[in-house]
Amino acid sequence: MPIRIPDQLPAADVLRTENIFVMSETRAASQEIRPLRVLILNLMPKKIETETQFLRLLSNSPLQVNVELLRIDDRPSKNTPTEHLDNFYRQFEMVKNRNFDGLIITGAPLGLVQFEDVIYWDHLKTIMEWAKSHVTSTLYVCWAAQAGLKLLYDLPKKTRKEKLSGVYHHRIHKPYHPVLRGFDDSFLAPHSRYADFSPEYLAEHTDLDILATSDDAGVYLATTKDKRNVFVTGHPEYDPHTLHNEYIRDLGEGMEPAIPVNYYPNDNPDNPPIASWRSHGHLLFSNWLNYCVYQQTPYDLDHFSEEAFTKDE
């Protein structure tokens, strides 16, 4: 089934060229089906690039998904046209009285910034708190995972000395967990972060189900028992060249970044990178939509109730 997005959203043309089924709002309105409502809080600077990446992963599901885009505040963006934000993004005040099946909170380039120094930290806390009573399942990605763990478990920020960048091997720990259905025992996924997610630390200080870890990258995937909060510390949504673009950017800014691990053939940045994580990313999002959202959400979102959710796996 397709994703439903505004007809004029730039991502629509990109996805159609990839033979991804994008349904127009007009056609979707004629179907007698209750689509899933998914809200994306986009915290990344290059919003058009990021929204396209997430929409691509949401499209690979038998479920019809209505996607709405949310911005954290009304400050002008240096990397996204104001017209685009005005046309396709909503303010929190416009959605706070509604319920959603799913919420995705993207990463943000704030790895070395303390939470209290993030200009929109209080607003982000408000949205995360709101999600508890208005969203069936929330997916926290990269920096958002660290922010979510701070809000839900009051975990302090832990930072690596060197940035983690590259494509890392991971192994699964609960093969029968719904979020892991269809996963290989070992899989690859990209990381680009300073945050440190130690399996031992999370196991000691939270009751999370730790689903996948890496010897080098730490915890990659974890969920609360009720699957209403899913934490992904990497970037399964990344395009093949995203890590490359970040590497070139950091070089241009006079930094001395390490070459992303297991990314360029022969570790040579002159060689085009190979996307070895694409199938994993699609499966992860498909499982989240099916088992954490669709199987748990009420048919009538107007009668949303936290007590209605089962905690069975």
Curated annotation (Swiss-Prot):
The keyword Lyase does not apply. It is found in: Cytoplasm. It comes from the Bacteria. It catalyses: L-homoserine + succinyl-CoA = O-succinyl-L-homoserine + CoA. SUPFAM superfamilies: Class I glutamine amidotransferase-like. The active site is at C142, H235, E237. Keywords: Acyltransferase, Amino-acid biosynthesis, Cytoplasm, Methionine biosynthesis, Transferase. Substrate binds at K163, S192, R249. It is an enzyme of class 2 (transferase). GO terms for molecular function: homoserine O-acetyltransferase activity; homoserine O-succinyltransferase activity. Pfam families: HTS. Its EC number is 2.3.1.46. The record marks G111 as: Important for acyl-CoA specificity. The record marks S192 as: Important for substrate specificity. Belongs to the MetA family. This is Homoserine O-succinyltransferase. The lineage of its organism: Bacteria, Pseudomonadati, Pseudomonadota, Gammaproteobacteria, Vibrionales. The gene is metAS.
